[in-house]
């Protein structure tokens, strides 16, 4: 076999693309005052053109500011222009100050150039901004916040990472520019901004493709979509459940199950066909925003006085929540819009090659039993598990499952139980028990210690404590340095008890349904040494272990060494800022074209991962300009505020769904 090596060349030049007057060219500062460190890159030339050749698979370059930190706070984006000279595409990821959340990414096609946009996050908002724009995560003027660990006025470094680069590939990275001026509104400028949401739920002060100005345009968009779905009703190689009808047929049980087939984990549908779960969450809802106390943000809805506002407005807990999405469906379909929404949601998903209605979706859509779905049970208090040793924990689970219509429904794939629990480190649960959060668990902890230690004096020696009686131990809430091993042991015992109880409850009340796990939070838990302990425990009880994984790829998600179990992505997304919303989501995608491209690659990577049996995008709708209850106002939907598709993402989903079974079976 002949091997061809393509060289990687990274070149920084001082020529820049056309930049606005308020943009800042960062490259001259880099070359004059900053420092550059590389990993897996070899410098081959000097001067103002910086040129490296990759010497290994996976490489990166880090640019540091020097003695004085950079001030990125006047800008919204850091933009790097990347030219790929190789004969295959190149993945590029940018990080600001090494922060997990502040990233930008893109796939640069072979022999092409692409601009990689990185969103400059704000660590916190001023008191004035919080008062002027309450309960909004993204604000007018370019302010977006997540859990970033840096301050934009003091940036010390940023990196460009090439995790899939091969030794010898060539790339030119040129023109580093800070773009789009950042602005904070106050005084007259703030007053002039108001109202900033129009009668259709769109941001007033921006122009973008697809923005409407009248009801007629909503109707026109609906007709266009109907014709599109007529042209593409769905994948003809799928069976009624979305399984691979043209593929092998395994044992049919009448329900979904999981099986390892030819070295890869698969779901198997009720008819025995291989099934890979290509899904979307929150189908049929998820755009409500509280208008009470913020009335000045919104233009009048311009509706007749006779309109029944309860069709799109709900009032609860001192909140008045308006769904512009429902209002706009009312405008095009009338009072019976819900019936048409349910029908269209089912036809849409099939047309988009989506075969799973994922978490938190509308029960009325699910009950049509036209597309497989996942069910969800919540036992948690915030991010805390319930006390797994409480008698009510198991009883409550069984009552909830028994009352669920999904328990015996062949269209239900399985149950997620809880979401993004706070597991902490491997002593966390025992520490909470010791401190009194879990009284039943604390009693069990005491009894295990009584069995382990010959006497309380022996425990005191190990822990460095001075308990006179076990009653004293029960009253104590202090954590002693010598207790670490016992805390580790009991944390494991508690976690086992939690997952075991859920598994047994599902087996008792929904024996044919899969236990899909607890949707581990955000990062790459598998492979993370700090958190691997809890993933391995979950895998003993879950039929499929789930991760809400907001990264740019799912390919590297693997069980720990010597483990083998199926996994599923419960949430991921890539957001944009080019369609009138004010926040780019938990993973920024930039333009609609780029976020669609990121979607396509993410799902294809997951399809090729032998352990993954599905990906579920969060979420069906774009969120509201002024945000949901916790302030999320992300442009992350498959559809926009007036119920029209975000076409770039639709095309990406169709493309992936058209070939996913053939790709996975290779």
Annotated model-derived regions:
Residues 203-368, 382-410, 474, 480-481, ...:
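Active-site-adjacent substrate/metal-binding segments within catalytic domains
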Residues 40-60:
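Short carbohydrate-recognition loop motifs
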């Amino acid at each position: 076999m002949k091997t061809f090596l393509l060289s990687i060349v990274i070149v920084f030049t001082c020529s820049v693309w056309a930049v606005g007057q308020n943009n800042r060219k960062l490259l001259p500062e880099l070359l004059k005052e900053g420092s550059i460190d590389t990993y897996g890159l070899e410098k081959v030339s000097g001067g103002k053109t910086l040129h490296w050749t990759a010497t290994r698979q996976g490489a990166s370059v880090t640019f540091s500011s020097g003695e004085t930190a950079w001030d990125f706070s006047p800008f919204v984006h850091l933009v790097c222009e990347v030219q790929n000279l190789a004969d295959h595409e190149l993945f590029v990821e940018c990080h600001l100050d090494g922060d997990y959340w502040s990233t930008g990414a893109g796939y640069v096609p072979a022999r092409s150039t692409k601009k990689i946009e990185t969103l400059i996050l704000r660590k916190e908002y001023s008191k004035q901004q919080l008062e002027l724009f309450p309960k909004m995560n993204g604000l007018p003027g370019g302010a977006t916040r997540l859990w970033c660990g840096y301050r934009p006025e003091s940036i010390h470094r940023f990196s460009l990472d090439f995790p899939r680069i091969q030794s010898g590939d060539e790339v030119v990275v040129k023109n580093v520019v800070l773009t789009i001026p950042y602005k904070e509104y106050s005084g007259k400028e703030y007053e002039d901004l108001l109202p900033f949401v129009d009668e259709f739920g769109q941001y007033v002060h921006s122009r973008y493709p697809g923005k409407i100005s009248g009801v007629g345009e909503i109707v026109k968009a609906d007709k266009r979509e109907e014709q599109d779905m007529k042209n593409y009703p769905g994948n003809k190689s799928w069976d009624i459940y979305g399984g691979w009808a043209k593929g092998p047929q395994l044992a049919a049980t009448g329900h979904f199950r999981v099986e390892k087939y030819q070295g890869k984990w698969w779901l198997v549908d009720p008819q025995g066909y291989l099934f890979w779960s290509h899904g979307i969450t929150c189908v049929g809802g998820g755009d409500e925003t509280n208008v009470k106390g913020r009335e000045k943000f919104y233009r009048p809805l311009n509706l007749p006085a006779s309109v029944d506002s309860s069709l799109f407005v709900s009032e609860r807990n001192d909140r008045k929540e308006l769904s512009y999405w429902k209002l706009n469906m009312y405008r095009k379909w009338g009072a019976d819009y819900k019936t048409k929404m349910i029908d269209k949601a089912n036809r849409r998903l099939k047309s988009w090659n989506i075969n799973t209605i994922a978490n938190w979706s509308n029960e009325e859509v699910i009950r049509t039993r036209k597309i497989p779905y996942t069910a969800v049970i919540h036992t948690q208090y915030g991010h805390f598990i319930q006390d797994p040793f409480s008698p009510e924990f198991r009883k409550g689970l069984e009552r909830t499952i028994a009352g669920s219509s999904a328990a015996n429904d062949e269209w239900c794939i399985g149950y997620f139980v809880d979401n993004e629990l706070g597991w902490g480190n491997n002593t966390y649960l025992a520490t909470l028990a010791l401190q009194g959060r879990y009284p039943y668990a604390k009693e069990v902890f005491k009894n295990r210690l009584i069995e382990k230690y010959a006497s309380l004096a022996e425990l005191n020696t190990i822990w460095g404590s001075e308990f006179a009686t076990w009653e004293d131990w029960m009253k104590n809430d202090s954590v002693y340095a010598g207790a670490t091993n016992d805390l580790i042991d009991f944390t494991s015992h508690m976690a086992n008890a939690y997952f075991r109880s859920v598994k047994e409850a599902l087996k008792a009340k929904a024996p044919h349904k899969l236990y899909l796990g607890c949707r581990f939070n955000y990062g790459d838990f598998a492979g993370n040494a700090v958190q691997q302990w809890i993933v391995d425990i979950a895998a003993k009880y879950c039929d499929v272990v789930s991760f809400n994984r907001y990264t740019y790829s799912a390919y590297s998600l693997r069980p720990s060494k010597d483990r083998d179990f199926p996994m599923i992505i419960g949430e991921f997304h890539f957001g944009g800022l080019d369609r009138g919303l004010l926040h780019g989501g938990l993973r920024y995608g930039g333009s609609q074209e780029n976020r669609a491209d990121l979607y396509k690659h993410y799902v294809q990577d997951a399809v090729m991962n032998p352990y993954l049996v599905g990906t579920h995008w969060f979420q069906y709708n774009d969120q509201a300009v002024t945000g949901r209850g916790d302030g999320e106002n992300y442009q992350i939907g498959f559809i926009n505020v007036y119920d029209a598709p975000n076409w770039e993402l639709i095309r990406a989903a169709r493309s992936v769904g058209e070939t996913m079974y053939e790709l996975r079976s290779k």
